[in-house]
């Protein structure tokens, strides 16, 4: 909390808050809980379209899939905890977002994990990578929710740090919707799940400041302890309770613990609460009311239930061997009152906890884009360097640790442009997540637009019509004028791109203060998207003899590219997005898929056309012969990361029909046992065996 905020609190209260009140206010006024630096700007994002049932404002967003099925989606970051204790930090990040989905009344059916680390040459970064993945794998596998996609990226700005974002998707029937707020007084507040311990105390205040040099030792107690077995029981018990229709409001005890869950639950509609803190089941002896109220122990839910229904729902919790206790009640008066063993120990106006004033930090525009010379290097050598890049090689080492098929819904597995989950016999849900901090660092506005259009292309590539988005905004300290400016520019880019496609953001997360010892991360907006796809229309893969075509224009756009990264070039101009072209090309590709004219579609993004073609070769173990004549230099055509492009494969007899729908540049043909790419006479020639060995096995070798 800042000094001017403490002064404001004293003025509003007319007195000095006691230690417990101060601790609760610190939690609620933290950046992590209050969004005080971002709230004003988040209003620029579109939040409504014909698919949206519930937009931002609760624990997760809801989209209509059909009349009987709603899709619930949310995204969270667990960056600081994962940097300090990677296993526990990542695992509890999964647990938290799963409970956010659960408390809307939905069954969690899938996870996505966009995760980022420093260069793998360093042992500390390999350690963070290994244990973040292990934390996500162990927790997701044990609760029976498949991790079906995500992205893994390595960047020098993340040295000794990690960005761990987790998205969760749930499915529900409309009649099971439960809100996170109460609409009447007199309800009992019931805590269910794990006992409360001292773990995670000050977790949200720790997440609202930069990490110091000794964070690993000093901040470990702020990281919560994961318990996936209790979470699994909590999922089943909560859903059974929800299906009775007797749960009036439901919140997960996440950041800010009981203080945050209870005050937000009652305060949204202007009610208050009495909390009997001594009734909270404790894991450790001698805990104080302050520790109880702000502990962030995991696997706990807060239910609002009518007094006459408490015993009935209590029996459900007991059936799953979950501890439960009535810890408070909803009152008409807008006050938040805490008792401890019969003694009143805190009393605050509810508004003081839930209505935190916004802060606008100074902004300073930065311009670092400049045209640069591409270093002299042969096409073959450049290809080898890019193809071996940890950002390009397969992340099978990651997703092989995840059970991505539990629940039996996974139609398209990890590693492709989007995962697809079967929702009913006819339709599936496509899900994907993307970010590009290198582009966003060069130009936050165009970089952010680029993230959105890549999400759209990834959904479209499997034949899905995009429905909605969620965003996770990872930034350094907003107190840095350049960072705050880049944050606002990012939101403008995210908004403009989504509006062009008629898409809405239904939920999201802002994570500031991502820096270690004065070293800020690059602007890293991550966007996850969902789309609806007809299962029988999904393109299943190229066949021998198929033609390969490129939809979309390739320009000389190497700024922020993977080629520049491996060559050590940090400047350049980020690729620009033409929203009209993106829309037109997306519509054309959907039509090609709908009419069954193409055998496969792949979005062109990181690594450009060269990488997209080589991925096609390795994914399906097919040879490719490609000969291209272009006005661009071979390196520019091969590795440009221009937006709006798709690789499509199709039988030769469909060529004329394809051309009628989309302007297409023929690149070559599927066949043989070699990958041959010739641009203006300059050649890359590799066996499919060599390509595949590097692609599938390189990360295992690095992590061995």
UniProtKB/Swiss-Prot annotation:
User: What Enzyme Commission number(s) does the record list for this chain?
Assistant: 6.3.5.3
Q: Where in the cell is it found?
A: Cytoplasm
UniProt keywords, alphabetically: ATP-binding, Cytoplasm, Ligase, Magnesium, Metal-binding, Nucleotide-binding, Purine biosynthesis
Residues that hold substrate according to the record? 77-80, 99, 224, 296-298, 511
Q: Where does Mg(2+) 1 bind?
A: 76, 509
Superkingdom of origin organism: Archaea
Set out the biological process GO terms recorded for this chain's protein: 'de novo' IMP biosynthetic process
Active site residues according to the UniProt entry: 32, 78 (proton acceptor)
Question: What does the record give as its pathway?
Answer: Purine metabolism; IMP biosynthesis via de novo pathway; 5-amino-1-(5-phospho-D-ribosyl)imidazole from N(2)-formyl-N(1)-(5-phospho-D-ribosyl)glycinamide: step 1/2
For this protein, what reaction is catalysed? N(2)-formyl-N(1)-(5-phospho-beta-D-ribosyl)glycinamide + L-glutamine + ATP + H2O = 2-formamido-N(1)-(5-O-phospho-beta-D-ribosyl)acetamidine + L-glutamate + ADP + phosphate + H(+)
Q: Which residues bind Mg(2+) 2?
A: 100, 252
Per the record, its GO cellular-component terms are: cytoplasm
Please list the residues that bind ATP: 35, 471, 508
Q: Name one GO molecular function term.
A: ATP binding
Query: A Pfam family in this protein?
Result: AIRS_C
Looking up Gene3D superfamilies in the UniProt record yields: PurM-like C-terminal domain (3.90.650.10), PurM-like, N-terminal domain (3.30.1330.10)
Does the record's keyword annotation contain Transcription regulation?
no
The record's comment on protein family reads:
Belongs to the FGAMS family.
Instruction: Fill in the subunit field for this protein.
Output: Monomer. Part of the FGAM synthase complex composed of 1 PurL, 1 PurQ and 2 PurS subunits.
Q: What does this protein do?
A: Part of the phosphoribosylformylglycinamidine synthase complex involved in the purines biosynthetic pathway. Catalyzes the ATP-dependent conversion of formylglycinamide ribonucleotide (FGAR) and glutamine to yield formylglycinamidine ribonucleotide (FGAM) and glutamate. The FGAM synthase complex is composed of three subunits. PurQ produces an ammonia molecule by converting glutamine to glutamate. PurL transfers the ammonia molecule to FGAR to form FGAM in an ATP-dependent manner.
Its name, as the record gives it, is Phosphoribosylformylglycinamidine synthase subunit PurL
Species: Pyrococcus furiosus (strain ATCC 43587 / DSM 3638 / JCM 8422 / Vc1)
Supply the source organism's classification: Archaea, Methanobacteriati, Methanobacteriota, Thermococci, Thermococcales
**Gene that encodes the chain:** purL
């Amino acid at each position: 909390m800042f000094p001017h905020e403490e002064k404001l609190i004293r003025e509003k209260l007319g007195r000095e808050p006691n230690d417990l009140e101060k601790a609760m206010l610190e939690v609620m006024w933290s950046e992590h809980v209050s969004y005080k630096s971002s709230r004003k700007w988040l209003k620029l994002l579109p939040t409504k379209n014909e698919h949206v049932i519930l937009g931002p404002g609760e624990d997760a967003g809801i989209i209509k899939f059909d009349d009987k099925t709603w899709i619930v989606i949310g995204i969270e970051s667990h960056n600081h905890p994962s940097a300090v204790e990677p296993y526990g930090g990542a695992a509890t990040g999964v647990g938290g977002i799963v409970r956010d989905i659960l408390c809307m009344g939905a069954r969690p059916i899938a996870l996505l994990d966009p995760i980022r680390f420093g260069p793998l040459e360093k042992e500390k970064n390999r350690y963070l990578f290994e244990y973040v993945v292990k934390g996500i794998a162990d927790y997701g596998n044990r609760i029976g929710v498949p991790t079906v996609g995500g992205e893994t990226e390595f960047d020098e700005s993340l040295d000794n740090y990690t960005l761990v974002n987790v998205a969760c998707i749930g499915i529900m029937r409309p009649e099971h919707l439960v809100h996170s707020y109460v609409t009447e007084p007199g309800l009992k507040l019931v805590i269910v799940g794990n006992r409360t311990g001292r773990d995670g105390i000050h977790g949200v205040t720790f997440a609202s400041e930069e990490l110091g040099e000794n964070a690993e030792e000093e901040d470990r107690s702020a990281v919560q302890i994961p318990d996936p077995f209790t979470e699994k029981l909590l999922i089943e018990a909560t859903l059974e309770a929800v299906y009775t229709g007797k749960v009036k409001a439901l919140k997960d005890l996440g950041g800010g613990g009981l203080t945050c869950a209870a005050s937000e639950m009652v305060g949204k509609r202007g009610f208050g609460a009495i909390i009997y803190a001594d009734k909270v089941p404790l894991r450790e002896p001698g805990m104080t009311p302050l520790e109880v109220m702000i502990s962030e122990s995991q696997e706990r839910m807060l239910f609002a239930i009518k007094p006459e229904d408490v015993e009935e729902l209590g029996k459900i919790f007991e059936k799953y061997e979950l501890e439960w206790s009535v810890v408070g009640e909803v009152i008409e008066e807008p006050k938040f009152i805490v008792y401890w063993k019969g003694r009143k120990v805190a009393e605050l106006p509810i508004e003081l906890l839930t209505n935190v004033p916004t802060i606008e930090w100074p902004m300073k525009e930065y311009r670092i884009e400049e045209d640069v010379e591409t270093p002299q290097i042969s096409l073959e050598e450049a290809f080898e360097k890019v193809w071996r890049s940890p950002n390009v090689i397969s992340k099978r080492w990651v997703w092989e640790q995840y059970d991505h098929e539990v629940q039996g819904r996974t139609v398209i597995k990890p590693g492709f442009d989007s995962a697809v989950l079967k929702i009913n016999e006819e339709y599936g849900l496509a899900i994907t997540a993307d970010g590009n901090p290198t582009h966003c660092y060069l130009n936050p506005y165009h970089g952010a637009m680029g993230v959105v259009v890549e999400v759209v292309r990834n959904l479209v590539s499997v034949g899905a019509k995009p429905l909605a988005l969620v965003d996770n905004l990872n930034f350094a300290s907003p107190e840095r004028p350049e960072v705050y400016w880049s944050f606002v520019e990012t939101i403008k880019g995210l908004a403009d791109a989504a509006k062009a496609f008629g898409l809405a953001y239904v939920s999201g997360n802002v994570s500031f203060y991502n820096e270690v010892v004065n070293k800020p991360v690059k602007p890293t907006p991550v966007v996850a998207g969902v789309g609806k796809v007809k299962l029988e229309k999904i393109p299943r893969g190229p066949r021998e003899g198929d033609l390969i075509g490129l939809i979309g224009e390739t320009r000389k756009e190497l700024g922020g590219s993977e080629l520049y990264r491996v060559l050590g070039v940090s400047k350049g101009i980020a690729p620009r997005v033409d929203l009209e072209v993106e829309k037109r090309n997306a519509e054309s590709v959907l039509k090609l898929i709908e009419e069954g004219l193409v055998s496969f579609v792949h979005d062109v993004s990181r690594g450009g056309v060269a990488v997209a073609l080589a991925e096609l070769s390795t994914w399906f173990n097919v040879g490719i012969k490609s000969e291209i004549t272009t006005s661009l230099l071979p390196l520019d055509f091969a590795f440009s990361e221009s937006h709006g492009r798709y690789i499509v494969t199709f039988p030769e007899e469909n060529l004329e029909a394809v051309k009628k729908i989309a302007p297409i540049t023929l690149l070559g043909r599927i066949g043989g046992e070699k990958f041959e790419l010739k641009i203006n006479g300059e050649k890359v020639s590799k066996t499919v065996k060599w390509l595949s060995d590097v692609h599938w096995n390189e990360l295992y070798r690095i992590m061995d």
